Protein backbone atom coordinates (compact mmCIF):
# COMPACT_ATOMS: atom_id res chain seq x y z
CA UNK A 1 0.00 0.00 0.00
CA UNK A 2 2.70 2.49 1.00
CA UNK A 3 4.78 1.90 -2.12
CA UNK A 4 1.73 2.35 -4.34
CA UNK A 5 0.83 5.65 -2.66
CA UNK A 6 4.40 6.88 -2.90
CA UNK A 7 4.61 6.14 -6.60
CA UNK A 8 1.57 8.31 -7.21
CA UNK A 9 3.24 11.34 -5.61
CA UNK A 10 1.00 11.80 -2.55
CA UNK A 11 3.50 12.10 0.33
CA UNK A 12 0.92 12.74 3.06
CA UNK A 13 -1.02 9.62 2.15
CA UNK A 14 2.27 7.80 1.88
CA UNK A 15 3.09 8.87 5.44
CA UNK A 16 -0.21 7.40 6.63
CA UNK A 17 0.63 4.21 4.77
CA UNK A 18 3.97 3.99 6.55
CA UNK A 19 2.14 3.93 9.89
CA UNK A 20 -0.07 0.98 8.97
CA UNK A 21 2.37 -1.92 8.86
CA UNK A 22 4.11 -1.20 12.21
CA UNK A 23 0.70 -0.72 13.82
CA UNK A 24 -0.62 -4.04 12.50
CA UNK A 25 2.66 -5.75 13.45
CA UNK A 26 2.44 -4.52 17.04
CA UNK A 27 -1.15 -5.72 17.40
CA UNK A 28 -0.13 -9.11 16.00
CA UNK A 29 2.99 -9.29 18.19
CA UNK A 30 1.02 -8.35 21.30
CA UNK A 31 -1.47 -11.19 20.76
CA UNK A 32 1.30 -13.65 19.82
CA UNK A 33 3.48 -12.76 22.81
CA UNK A 34 0.58 -13.39 25.20
CA UNK A 35 0.16 -17.01 24.12
CA UNK A 36 3.32 -18.46 22.47
CA UNK A 37 2.15 -21.96 23.35
CA UNK A 38 -0.70 -21.55 20.86
CA UNK A 39 1.62 -20.37 18.09
CA UNK A 40 0.84 -23.28 15.75
CA UNK A 41 -2.89 -22.72 16.11
CA UNK A 42 -2.38 -19.02 15.42
CA UNK A 43 -0.12 -19.86 12.48
CA UNK A 44 -2.87 -21.95 10.88
CA UNK A 45 -5.25 -19.01 11.22
CA UNK A 46 -2.68 -16.66 9.67
CA UNK A 47 -2.09 -18.95 6.69
CA UNK A 48 -5.85 -19.30 6.16
CA UNK A 49 -6.46 -15.56 6.17
CA UNK A 50 -3.37 -14.83 4.08
CA UNK A 51 -4.73 -17.12 1.36
CA UNK A 52 -8.22 -15.62 1.63
CA UNK A 53 -6.77 -12.11 1.40
CA UNK A 54 -4.51 -12.68 -1.62
CA UNK A 55 -7.27 -12.18 -4.26
CA UNK A 56 -8.27 -8.89 -2.58
CA UNK A 57 -4.62 -7.85 -2.56
CA UNK A 58 -4.21 -8.74 -6.25
CA UNK A 59 -7.35 -6.71 -7.05
CA UNK A 60 -6.15 -3.68 -5.09
CA UNK A 61 -2.67 -3.73 -6.64
CA UNK A 62 -3.70 -4.64 -10.18
CA UNK A 63 -1.32 -2.86 -12.62
CA UNK A 64 0.83 -1.72 -9.67
CA UNK A 65 2.53 -4.95 -8.60
CA UNK A 66 3.36 -8.23 -10.40
CA UNK A 67 0.94 -11.11 -9.92
CA UNK A 68 3.35 -12.97 -7.63
CA UNK A 69 3.64 -10.12 -5.09
CA UNK A 70 2.31 -11.28 -1.72
CA UNK A 71 0.14 -9.54 0.86
CA UNK A 72 1.29 -8.46 4.31
CA UNK A 73 -0.65 -11.22 6.09
CA UNK A 74 1.89 -13.67 4.70
CA UNK A 75 4.56 -11.82 6.71
CA UNK A 76 2.51 -12.56 9.82
CA UNK A 77 1.89 -16.14 8.69
CA UNK A 78 5.62 -16.72 8.21
CA UNK A 79 6.44 -15.13 11.59
CA UNK A 80 3.79 -17.07 13.49
CA UNK A 81 5.03 -20.29 11.88
CA UNK A 82 8.60 -19.45 12.89
CA UNK A 83 7.49 -18.90 16.48
CA UNK A 84 5.54 -22.18 16.39
CA UNK A 85 8.67 -24.04 15.31
CA UNK A 86 11.32 -22.25 17.37
CA UNK A 87 9.54 -21.58 20.68
CA UNK A 88 9.11 -25.29 21.57
CA UNK A 89 12.34 -26.17 19.67
CA UNK A 90 10.69 -28.63 17.31
CA UNK A 91 12.84 -31.06 15.31
CA UNK A 92 14.83 -29.37 12.53
CA UNK A 93 13.26 -26.04 13.53
CA UNK A 94 16.18 -23.92 12.33
CA UNK A 95 16.46 -25.68 8.96
CA UNK A 96 12.71 -25.34 8.38
CA UNK A 97 12.81 -21.70 9.46
CA UNK A 98 15.64 -20.79 7.08
CA UNK A 99 13.87 -22.53 4.18
CA UNK A 100 10.59 -20.77 4.96
CA UNK A 101 12.25 -17.35 5.03
CA UNK A 102 14.15 -18.12 1.81
CA UNK A 103 10.92 -19.05 0.01
CA UNK A 104 8.91 -15.99 1.04
CA UNK A 105 11.48 -13.19 1.45
CA UNK A 106 11.62 -12.11 -2.18
CA UNK A 107 7.90 -12.16 -3.17
CA UNK A 108 7.11 -10.38 0.10
CA UNK A 109 9.74 -7.72 -0.62
CA UNK A 110 7.80 -6.47 -3.66
CA UNK A 111 4.94 -4.91 -1.67
CA UNK A 112 5.09 -6.22 1.90
CA UNK A 113 8.51 -5.27 3.33
CA UNK A 114 10.20 -8.65 2.88
CA UNK A 115 13.01 -9.49 5.31
CA UNK A 116 12.73 -6.11 7.03
CA UNK A 117 9.07 -6.79 7.81
CA UNK A 118 9.76 -10.32 9.05
CA UNK A 119 12.57 -9.06 11.31
CA UNK A 120 10.42 -6.25 12.69
CA UNK A 121 7.53 -8.57 13.54
CA UNK A 122 9.76 -11.17 15.21
CA UNK A 123 11.61 -8.56 17.28
CA UNK A 124 8.26 -7.04 18.25
CA UNK A 125 7.12 -10.44 19.53
CA UNK A 126 10.36 -10.81 21.48
CA UNK A 127 9.99 -7.33 22.98
CA UNK A 128 6.34 -7.70 23.98
CA UNK A 129 6.90 -11.18 25.40
CA UNK A 130 9.07 -9.65 28.11
CA UNK A 131 7.68 -7.71 31.07
CA UNK A 132 10.75 -5.47 31.01
CA UNK A 133 12.65 -5.86 27.70
CA UNK A 134 16.35 -5.07 27.97
CA UNK A 135 18.04 -2.21 26.15
CA UNK A 136 19.45 -4.45 23.43
CA UNK A 137 15.99 -5.70 22.44
CA UNK A 138 14.60 -2.15 22.48
CA UNK A 139 17.50 -0.94 20.33
CA UNK A 140 16.98 -3.80 17.88
CA UNK A 141 13.28 -2.96 17.73
CA UNK A 142 13.93 0.71 16.90
CA UNK A 143 16.54 -0.22 14.28
CA UNK A 144 14.22 -2.78 12.69
CA UNK A 145 11.45 -0.18 12.65
CA UNK A 146 13.68 2.34 10.88
CA UNK A 147 14.85 -0.35 8.44
CA UNK A 148 11.31 -0.54 7.05
CA UNK A 149 12.22 2.69 5.22
CA UNK A 150 15.39 1.29 3.66
CA UNK A 151 13.88 1.21 0.16
CA UNK A 152 12.89 4.88 0.42
CA UNK A 153 16.39 5.86 1.54
CA UNK A 154 17.71 4.60 -1.80
CA UNK A 155 15.60 6.89 -3.99
CA UNK A 156 14.25 9.88 -2.02
CA UNK A 157 15.91 12.98 -0.52
CA UNK A 158 16.81 12.47 3.13
CA UNK A 159 14.48 15.28 4.31
CA UNK A 160 11.49 13.65 2.63
CA UNK A 161 12.43 10.26 4.06
CA UNK A 162 12.57 11.72 7.58
CA UNK A 163 9.35 13.75 7.20
CA UNK A 164 7.20 11.19 5.39
CA UNK A 165 8.89 7.90 6.26
CA UNK A 166 10.80 7.69 9.52
CA UNK A 167 8.76 10.09 11.70
CA UNK A 168 5.34 8.60 10.79
CA UNK A 169 6.76 5.09 11.07
CA UNK A 170 7.94 5.84 14.61
CA UNK A 171 5.09 8.03 15.85
CA UNK A 172 2.04 5.77 15.75
CA UNK A 173 3.79 2.53 16.76
CA UNK A 174 5.39 4.20 19.79
CA UNK A 175 1.99 5.58 20.75
CA UNK A 176 0.50 2.11 20.32
CA UNK A 177 3.11 0.66 22.67
CA UNK A 178 1.63 2.72 25.49
CA UNK A 179 -1.83 1.38 24.67
CA UNK A 180 -0.66 -2.22 24.47
CA UNK A 181 1.10 -1.81 27.82
CA UNK A 182 -2.19 -0.77 29.42
CA UNK A 183 -4.02 -3.64 27.69
CA UNK A 184 -1.34 -6.09 28.85
CA UNK A 185 -1.87 -4.95 32.45
CA UNK A 186 -5.59 -5.81 32.27
CA UNK A 187 -5.03 -9.11 30.43
CA UNK A 188 -7.58 -8.17 27.75
CA UNK A 189 -7.24 -8.52 23.99
CA UNK A 190 -6.27 -5.33 22.22
CA UNK A 191 -8.92 -5.89 19.52
CA UNK A 192 -11.84 -8.33 19.26
CA UNK A 193 -10.92 -11.67 17.71
CA UNK A 194 -10.26 -11.59 13.94
CA UNK A 195 -11.17 -7.88 13.64
CA UNK A 196 -7.87 -7.11 11.94
CA UNK A 197 -8.41 -9.62 9.13
CA UNK A 198 -11.80 -8.20 8.20
CA UNK A 199 -10.46 -4.65 8.33
CA UNK A 200 -7.51 -5.56 6.15
CA UNK A 201 -9.61 -7.34 3.51
CA UNK A 202 -12.11 -4.49 3.58
CA UNK A 203 -9.53 -1.79 3.05
CA UNK A 204 -8.00 -3.74 0.15
CA UNK A 205 -11.43 -4.02 -1.45
CA UNK A 206 -11.93 -0.26 -1.10
CA UNK A 207 -8.48 0.43 -2.59
CA UNK A 208 -9.22 -1.93 -5.47
CA UNK A 209 -12.54 -0.24 -6.25
CA UNK A 210 -10.98 3.23 -6.09
CA UNK A 211 -8.12 2.11 -8.33
CA UNK A 212 -10.55 0.56 -10.84
CA UNK A 213 -12.62 3.75 -10.92
CA UNK A 214 -9.52 5.87 -11.46
CA UNK A 215 -8.45 3.64 -14.35
CA UNK A 216 -11.95 3.84 -15.84
CA UNK A 217 -11.95 7.63 -15.63
CA UNK A 218 -8.41 7.81 -16.99
CA UNK A 219 -7.03 9.55 -13.91
Role assignments for model-derived ranges:
Residues 1-219:
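Alpha-helical transmembrane segments and their immediate juxtamembrane cytosolic regions
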Amino acid sequence: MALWIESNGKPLLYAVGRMAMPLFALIFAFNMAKQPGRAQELAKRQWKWAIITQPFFAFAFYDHQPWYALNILLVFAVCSQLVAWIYPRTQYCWIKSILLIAIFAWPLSLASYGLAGIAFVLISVLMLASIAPDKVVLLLWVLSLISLNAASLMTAPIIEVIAFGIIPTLFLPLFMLTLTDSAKATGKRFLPRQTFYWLYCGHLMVLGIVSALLRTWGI
